[in-house]
């Protein structure tokens, strides 16, 4: 499955209560994500905190292939430790070192229909998101795609496979940036890890 095949098989739409009424219940295998996409997405939309989109099969419009929620975000340089700050400044080149934050978009939630797992849809959807925000359609600058990924091997592997890397190279530094007491039991491992994709790596059409 690649991006071209995804767009030929699916429609891309904003998620609304009407759309969900027309579809089978969406399940990606993570209860918290499924619950969010059933109801909480609307609160986020009403409060202007995030917009949720879906791909539906053209030949079976009742089946949602994938859903994701997007919000504005930024990578804030002052929150990074020295080695991670140097990495961001390296990829953004010398002329931009004085910026305190770099604009990005946050994938707040993303799920693929569990009946369609391991068929390449997840990678194709990520290719769509990165291409979408790298295109000239958008009215503001967006340098990075950011995600707060569930800290489990499958999820981390998915994002790494799709070109993401950790914002904090060491998990302990990420915990400190969150104000967590790393000496307390069960602080580590973190439930989620911040990761980013640098959109400058892909060219404009």
Each language-model region and where it sits:
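Extended hydrophobic secondary-structure segments that form protein cores and membrane-embedded regions
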Residues: 52-57, 68, 106-107, 144-150
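Conserved acyl-donor/pantetheine-binding loop and adjacent beta-alpha core of acyl/acetyltransferases
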Residues: 67-109, 175-177
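Conserved beta-hairpin
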Residues: 48-69, 82-84
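Conserved acetyl-CoA-binding loop-helix of GNAT-fold acetyltransferases
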Residues: 118-133
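C-terminal "cap" of GNAT-fold acetyltransferases
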Residues: 149-152, 172-205
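Conserved active-site alpha-helix within GNAT-family acetyltransferase domains
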Residues: 138, 149-170
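Short amphipathic alpha-helix that is part of the acyltransferase structural core
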Residues: 2-47, 54
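A short, internal acetyl-CoA/4′-phosphopantetheine-binding micro-motif in the GNAT/acyltransferase core
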Residues: 108-118
């Amino acid at each position: 499955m690649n991006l071209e095949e995804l767009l030929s098989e699916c429609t891309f739409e904003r998620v609304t209560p009407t759309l969900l009424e027309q579809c089978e219940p969406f399940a990606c295998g993570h209860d918290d994500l499924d619950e969010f996409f059933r109801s909480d997405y609307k609160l986020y939309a009403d409060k202007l905190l995030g917009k949720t989109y879906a791909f539906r099969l053209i030949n079976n419009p009742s089946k949602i292939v994938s859903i994701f929620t997007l919000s504005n975000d930024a990578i804030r340089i002052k929150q990074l430790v020295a080695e991670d700050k140097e990495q961001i400044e390296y990829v953004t080149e010398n002329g931009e070192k004085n910026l305190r934050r770099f604009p990005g978009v946050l994938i707040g939630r993303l799920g693929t229909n569990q009946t369609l797992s391991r068929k390449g849809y997840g990678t194709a959807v990520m290719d769509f998101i990165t291409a979408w925000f790298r295109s000239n359609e958008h009215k503001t600058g967006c340098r990075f795609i950011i995600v707060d990924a569930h800290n489990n091997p499958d999820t981390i592997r998915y994002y790494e496979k799709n070109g993401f890397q950790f914002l904090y190279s060491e998990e302990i530094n990420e915990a400190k940036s969150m104000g967590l007491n790393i000496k307390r039991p069960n602080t580590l491992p973190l439930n989620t890890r911040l990761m980013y994709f640098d959109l400058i790596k892909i060219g404009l059409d």
